[in-house]
Amino acid sequence: MWIGVISLFPEMFRAITDYGVTGRAVKKGLLSVQCWNPRDFTHDRHRTVDDRPYGGGPGMLMMVQPLRDAIHAAKAAAGEGAKVIYLSPQGRKLDQQGVCELSVSQKLILVCGRYEGIDERVIQTEIDEEWSIGDYVLSGGELPAMTLIDSISRFVPGVLGDQASAEEDSFVDGLLDCPHYTRPEVLQDMEVPPVLLSGNHAEIRRWRLKQSLGRTWLRRPELLESLALTDEQAKLLTQFRKEHAAQQDHEGCD
């Protein structure tokens, strides 16, 4: 997968290219991240990249010419078929479904805004899609861009040591992930659930599915509203709810 980034702070993306899963993917040649800085496309000695907005108001906007030239340079490097994405609070909110959709693209160009944003005409002429990572304000688009790169790279074949890791992540099937345990078996009087030590893979699968359903019901019940549960899932969720109610009653009596 090839990803181009338009940013005034390209050095921030070393967090993606030099570390962790994405860093290993870059070293293996599975992921390529290239950056273009609009400052490199300015024509004044101060390398100016911001200007005042028409109509007044607080803050500045990114200048059109350096930004457009940087986008055009990235497009030229990408060749045909690159999708240009602007990280924006006004964009579609990123979720796992969106990550899956974007991971199909082999070439992406991510535009990171700064200041109060970018000229609307640049959005109209250069941007294919706008995406947001949530309903809150950040200082720029770099962190959302890194979030996007990290999440979609997990779907690139070979990036993860075990592809099942991506397939079992939270939200992949519309549910939160189940609890996980490693050694020791007992930690401060808290034991690993016996079923995970049983070696019975069918029961382990059922336990994990039940916990995933239950955790979603407890923490993100709205996610269940859009799911058509199978008979097995419905039964397991009912079991979880009964067990949870019994536990609450027991704790209330203590």
From Swiss-Prot:
Gene3D superfamilies: 3.40.1280.10, tRNA(m1g37)methyltransferase, domain 2 (1.10.1270.20). The keyword Kinase does not apply. It catalyses: guanosine(37) in tRNA + S-adenosyl-L-methionine = N(1)-methylguanosine(37) in tRNA + S-adenosyl-L-homocysteine + H(+). Belongs to the RNA methyltransferase TrmD family. PANTHER family: TRNA (GUANINE-N(1)-)-METHYLTRANSFERASE (PTHR46417:SF1). Homodimer. This is tRNA (guanine-N(1)-)-methyltransferase. The gene is trmD.
